[in-house]
Amino acid sequence: MQQRRPIRRALLSVSDKAGIVEFAQALSHRGVELLSTGGTARLLADAGLAVTEVSDYTGFPEMMDGRVKTLHPKVHGGILGRRDQDDAIMAQHDIKPIDIVVVNLYPFAQTVARENCTLEDAVENIDIGGPTMVRSAAKNHKDVAIVVKSSDYSAIINEIDANEGSLTYETRFDLAIKAFEHTAAYDSMIANYFGALVPPYHGETDKPSGNFPRTLNLNYIKKQDMRYGENSHQQAAFYIEENIHEASVATSTQLQGKALSYNNIADTDAALECVKEFAEPACVIVKHANPSGVAIGGSILDAYERAYKTDPTSAFGGIIAFNRELDEETAQAIISRQFVEVIIAPSASEAALKVTAAKQNVRVLTSGNWQQRVPGLDFKRVNGGLLIQDRDLGMVDASQLRVVTERQPSEQELRDALFCWKVAKFVKSNAIVYARDNMTIGIGAGQMSRVYSAKIAGIKAGDEGLEVKGSAMASDAFFPFRDGIDAAAAVGITCVIQPGGSIRDDEVIAAANEHGIAMIFTDMRHFRH
């Protein structure tokens, strides 16, 4: 359907004023009459544009500190009026048709994100007139265009020029969908905010309010369709948050390679989130969502070489993440040595990209830099429901550790313990990590019993000829029995870091003392399922 509608009159009322003057100038230069409200009208007038205040157009002043501006029949009649049906009644009441509505809403999300936000602040930033105009224009998209995103301004002007002052139905329909998505997201934010202030269970006032809203509304934007999901018979797509405050796989830019698969994205996320844990130059290699090798070094090349040594077999077809710019030397080392699915780093040098270009199927992503880890929510889908928890940003430093054995760890053992503790947080439970000199030497992941994860970590180290004697071992959760300590001692582990908290802690500590192992309690668990 190519039905065009000429753009002769525009109503502009925006909270985010980025680009609005330029857009209004472009409309005005094309003969479009401008209506506006409040601060937007003043901004346009100050820019030298001929603009009519809505209050002058309606003959009704803005009132109640701006709460009532556009809620008037001459405004909504002009937006909702059907051009082929309501012309007579519009003329009878001197209602002029409004062809394009440009609105974005009060900054509710930014307001409630402030530390000192009060309930009154939140209430005053609930937009009423804005969403009403947006929904009115979107409903009447057959005749009216609604614009809620400044990123659409230039494309709209281009289409007006290409279509002799008109917009097509297809464009108006697409803009209407964006508008409904916009108001849905806005109302969801408001519902989530106020829902967290009342008892969470409908009608059950005796239950504690908790930290989560009683109704959860989520809004995500589709970034891409996938060829298939985790398996080829499953359909899939990748959705991202609208406002992302931390560099992540969702913010990443793909510089080369085939389209990312569902599994690529999941594994890249696992690798990137792990490498963010380190301040020093670090490399993480991931396979099937588990780290197969992690190391820090004097450079990312050094870190990569050491991470690769942990498990060269599993590194084949893996995901490699760095926390520094990908440089030429490191790119060359990877490309000449192994098959890799994805390389992700904060940035990549031009020289590095020339190297990776020789392997066009290799996906190279840049995430941008991250300053800090941002609190958020993690979700796990279960049949018929959704589990929600705070993102696991728990960390410990040396001052928070408790040595519970007769022997104190050496400085080297303590460094190794803290290193492998960071890694264990990103290994599927039951997780055991062996490490020495800032390098993993064996990882046991995802076993149903902790002792078998410990045995597997030792087997992996032995298979690669890596010396375990004198190494540290991290466990993501407590040891329910002493057998895990016995298995570690058998291969030469001399320091263990774990949360503690088992009813058999005394037996586990006694086993460590028998073997001369230093044991550290963190009092923090890092299950990962």
From Swiss-Prot:
Pathway assigned in UniProt: Purine metabolism; IMP biosynthesis via de novo pathway; 5-formamido-1-(5-phospho-D-ribosyl)imidazole-4-carboxamide from 5-amino-1-(5-phospho-D-ribosyl)imidazole-4-carboxamide (10-formyl THF route): step 1/1; Purine metabolism; IMP biosynthesis via de novo pathway; IMP from 5-formamido-1-(5-phospho-D-ribosyl)imidazole-4-carboxamide: step 1/1
Protein known as: Bifunctional purine biosynthesis protein PurH
Gene name as annotated: purH
Biological-process GO terms, alphabetical: 'de novo' IMP biosynthetic process
Organism from which the protein derives: Pectobacterium carotovorum subsp. carotovorum (strain PC1)
Superkingdom per UniProt: Bacteria
Keywords (A to Z) from UniProt: Hydrolase, Multifunctional enzyme, Purine biosynthesis, Transferase
Xref: InterPro entries: AICAR_Tfase_dup_dom_sf, Cytidine_deaminase-like, MGS-like_dom, MGS-like_dom_sf, PurH-like
Lineage of source species: Bacteria, Pseudomonadati, Pseudomonadota, Gammaproteobacteria, Enterobacterales
Family according to the record: Belongs to the PurH family.
Catalytic activity: (6R)-10-formyltetrahydrofolate + 5-amino-1-(5-phospho-beta-D-ribosyl)imidazole-4-carboxamide = 5-formamido-1-(5-phospho-D-ribosyl)imidazole-4-carboxamide + (6S)-5,6,7,8-tetrahydrofolate; IMP + H2O = 5-formamido-1-(5-phospho-D-ribosyl)imidazole-4-carboxamide
